[in-house]
Amino acid sequence: MAKLITSFLLLTILFTFVCLTMSKEAEYHPESYGPGSLKSYQCGGQCTRRCSNTKYHKPCMFFCQKCCAKCLCVPPGTYGNKQVCPCYNNWKTQQGGPKCP
């Protein structure tokens, strides 16, 4: 019985450690985003990430790459968080809607 309890405690501690490690890796790092945080050759990969969950992949990629080339910034995540990249957030269409996905 003691071996069972010890094994359970060790597994619980190991599981907790793994969860904490994974959550630290997934944290938002502001120094990785923001105006000028990217080089122009990095836009393709960042836009692929940004547009990964949309059903309108081609237009998303087109406008994301256009915005990234101008702003050198792509917000974190696949949606929202545009406040991190002011240029990306403030570029509007003629109708006043957002130009950047």
From Swiss-Prot:
Stretches assigned to coiled coil: none
Cellular component per GO, a single term: extracellular region
PTM annotation: Six disulfide bonds may be present.
InterPro entries in the cross-refs: GASA (IPR003854)
UniProt xrefs under Pfam families: GASA
GO terms for biological process, alphabetical: gibberellic acid mediated signaling pathway; response to fructose; response to glucose; response to sucrose
PANTHER family listed in its UniProt record: EXTENSIN, PROLINE-RICH PROTEIN, GIBBERELLIN-REGULATED PROTEIN 6
Family to which this protein belongs: Belongs to the GASA family.
Protein name per Swiss-Prot or TrEMBL: Gibberellin-regulated protein 6
Classification lineage: Eukaryota, Viridiplantae, Streptophyta, Embryophyta, Tracheophyta
